[in-house]
Amino acid sequence: MNTARLNQGTPLLLNAVSKHYAENIVLNQLDLHIPAGQFVAVVGRSGGGKSTLLRLLAGLETPTAGDVLAGTTPLAEIQDDTRMMFQDARLLPWKSVIDNVGLGLKGQWRDAARQALAAVGLENRAGEWPAALSGGQKQRVALARALIHRPGLLLLDEPLGALDALTRLEMQDLIVSLWQEHGFTVLLVTHDVSEAVAMADRVLLIEEGKIGLDLTVDIPRPRRLGSVRLAELEAEVLQRVMQRGHSEQPIRRHG
């Protein structure tokens, strides 16, 4: 795997995207632009449409209406450039760690798989079985499995939700460092607002199928845990999430 930084990630443009399940409107004419290489976190209450948005971008669902574009190209036409991680690492227990990383690949892929494992600190576990790994190590393997494809877009659906606090912080740092190195676009869905503001360039709140808050995280990297500014931004997002009344227009907070 070439570990040189990619020229850019996948730029995303959603135009009036809606998703309905019978009478249930999950996404409601949602408009969104994400520049190439941006790290975006999505927060919100359960059922607000966060995971549905990720599934649309992953090609696991199709929109009821609207366009999902990578620049000017339908995202579905370049779906091979998109990879997704879930809360469950989804490793095949009957395959070794390195075989899980190279799943579905053909040709001479083992050197690339070893490089991907080295990037996540698990090169020495290549020949082991998934059962021998901790939860955090399994998620590192899942991340390596995404990296080997050199994605333009990495979708993260609560990938750290089941990890202990220390392992979660280590994984946050790893994901951010790999994003900085490779330049892919990241969309992270999380229920943890502190995680969102610690990792992302931008935090979106989705409520009632629309964007209710669009917040730029104006803190340089590396970010210091416990900083006053991080706490202020976290409080701002939490306050908005907890509001019962909803304005017609999204609230934007930049810089």
From Swiss-Prot:
Query: Could you name the domain of life of the organism this protein comes from?
Result: Bacteria
Keyword Nucleotide-binding listed: yes
What membrane topology is annotated for this entry? Peripheral membrane protein
- Annotated keywords: ATP-binding, Cell inner membrane, Cell membrane, Membrane, Nucleotide-binding, Translocase, Transport
Q: What is its EC number?
A: 7.6.2.14
Any Pfam family hit:
ABC_tran
* Residues reported in the UniProt entry to bind ATP: G44, R45, S46, G47, G48, G49, K50, S51
Q: Which reaction does it catalyse?
A: ATP + H2O + aliphatic sulfonate-[sulfonate-binding protein]Side 1 = ADP + phosphate + aliphatic sulfonateSide 2 + [sulfonate-binding protein]Side 1
A molecular function (GO) held by this record is: ATP hydrolysis activity
Could you tell me where this protein is found in the cell? Cell inner membrane
Q: Give the enzyme's main class according to its UniProt record, as a single word.
A: translocase
**UniProt keyword annotation of Membrane present:** yes
- Family affiliation: Belongs to the ABC transporter superfamily. Aliphatic sulfonates importer (TC 3.A.1.17.2) family.
Q: Function of this protein?
A: Part of the ABC transporter complex SsuABC involved in aliphatic sulfonates import. Responsible for energy coupling to the transport system.
Record-given protein name: Aliphatic sulfonates import ATP-binding protein SsuB
